[in-house]
């Protein structure tokens, strides 16, 4: 029998499953190399942890790793039901909250290595977490895609740690009782982008679709379709970073000015940015602040005679 030790948390309603023991050894390379090894040689462990019957399509997994730099707090590899993520904002907040719950860190600034670079997380005295993300930028403005059954949809392509297609003029109602329609709409947009080979820089797959609308209690409300076709319950840390990059590029948000981003279920992140290297008009360095709550400590058991020990593959 195999055992996987986990800490579950949620950040604004979006769950994170932190793996703290039981996965195969991935060597001493950087997080990008370890992610490659996990995907190529040990992907069954991701599936066992995230897929049904032990997980769900809503879960984001976070494998806790020893960092390359001994001055860093931790390394982490993020994954979900469809594969691997470069960075995850809500997951980083969940990681920090879980490490604090375990007594491994206290309030202060902590460096975390990810497959797309190092981020800086601050655990505040009130329990909230700020994540100083990897640089974000808008790659292309108002790109149009013809979506079968919908028509022409225009949006910005931006990087916030993952690739996003950000749409404001969509005509959809962003509400918790309209999730099926929102999912169908964003899935169709994502499929059209893929079919028409519309991609991020260097051919990066656009695997997140983000819709925006007004919100009475925040600067904006969003609906984010994640890889694997689940929607983000949180306001999405990397998605908010991509949004800040677009606002900065359009001159609609000043450096240091707060931006309150609400999710489709009403949870909120606060975002701010500064220009990378102090150069206006280029990439930004976004900081996202939110809160996570630990919901479980558990050990997943993978019995030798369990036909679904390694997940239900569809």
UniProtKB/Swiss-Prot annotation:
Binding site for substrate: 89-90, 208, 232, 237-238
Segments crossing the lipid bilayer: none
Keywords: Isomerase
Catalysis: reaction(s): trans-4-hydroxy-L-proline = cis-4-hydroxy-D-proline
EC number(s) recorded for this UniProt protein: 5.1.1.8
Classification via SUPFAM superfamilies: Diaminopimelate epimerase-like
Induction trigger: Is up-regulated when the bacterium is grown on t4LHyp or t3LHyp as sole carbon source.
GO MF entries: 4-hydroxyproline epimerase activity
Activity regulation comment: Inhibited by iodoacetate, iodoacetamide and by high amounts (10 mM) of pyrrole-2-carboxylate (PYC). Not inhibited by PYC at 1 mM.
Record flagged with keyword Lipoprotein: no
Classification via InterPro entries: Pro_racemase_fam
Described function: Allows intracellular utilization of 4-hydroxyproline, one of the major constituents of host collagen, by converting trans-4-hydroxy-L-proline (t4LHyp) to cis-4-hydroxy-D-proline (c4DHyp), which can be further metabolized by intracellular 4-hydroxy-D-proline oxidases. Strong B-cell mitogen. Plays an important role in the regulation of intra- and extracellular amino acid pools, allowing the bacterium to profit from host precursors and enzymatic pathways. Cannot use L-proline, trans-3-hydroxy-L-proline (t3LHyp) and pyrrolidone-5-carboxylate (P5C) as substrate.
Assigned protein family: Belongs to the proline racemase family.
Name of the protein this chain belongs to: 4-hydroxyproline 2-epimerase
Organism field: Pseudomonas aeruginosa (strain ATCC 15692 / DSM 22644 / CIP 104116 / JCM 14847 / LMG 12228 / 1C / PRS 101 / PAO1)
Highest classification ranks of the organism: Bacteria, Pseudomonadati, Pseudomonadota, Gammaproteobacteria, Pseudomonadales
């Amino acid at each position: 029998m195999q055992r996987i030790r986990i800490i579950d948390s949620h950040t604004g309603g979006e769950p994170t499953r932190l793996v703290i023991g039981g996965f195969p050894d991935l060597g001493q390379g950087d997080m990008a190399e370890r992610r490659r090894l996990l995907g190529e040689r040990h992907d069954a462990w991701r599936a066992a942890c995230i897929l049904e019957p032990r997980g769900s399509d809503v879960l984001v997994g976070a494998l806790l790793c020893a960092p390359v730099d001994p001055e860093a707090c931790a390394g982490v590899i993020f994954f979900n039901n469809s594969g691997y993520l470069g960075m995850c904002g809500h997951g980083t907040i969940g990681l920090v909250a879980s490490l604090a719950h375990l007594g491994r860190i206290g309030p202060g600034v902590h460096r975390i290595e990810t497959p797309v670079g190092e981020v800086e997380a601050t655990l505040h005295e009130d329990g909230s977490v700020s994540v100083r993300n990897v640089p974000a930028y808008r790659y292309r403005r108002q790109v149009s895609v013809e979506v079968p059954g919908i028509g022409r949809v225009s949006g910005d392509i931006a990087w916030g740690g993952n690739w996003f297609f950000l749409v404001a003029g969509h005509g959809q109602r962003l509400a918790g009782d309209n999730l099926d329609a929102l999912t169908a709409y964003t899935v169709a947009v994502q499929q059209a982008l893929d079919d028409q080979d519309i991609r991020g820089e260097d051919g990066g797959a656009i695997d997140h679709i983000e819709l925006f609308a007004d919100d009475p209690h925040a600067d904006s409300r969003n609906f984010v379709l994640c890889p694997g076709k689940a929607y983000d319950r949180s306001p999405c840390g990397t998605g908010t970073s991509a949004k800040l990059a677009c606002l900065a590029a359009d001159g609609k948000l000043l450096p240091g000015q707060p931006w309150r981003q609400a999710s489709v279920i009403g949870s909120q992140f606060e975002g701010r940015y500064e220009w990378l290297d102090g150069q206006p008009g280029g990439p930004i360095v976004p900081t996202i602040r939110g809160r996570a709550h630990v919901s479980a400590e558990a050990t997943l058991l993978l019995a030798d005679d369990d036909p679904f020990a390694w997940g239900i593959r569809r």
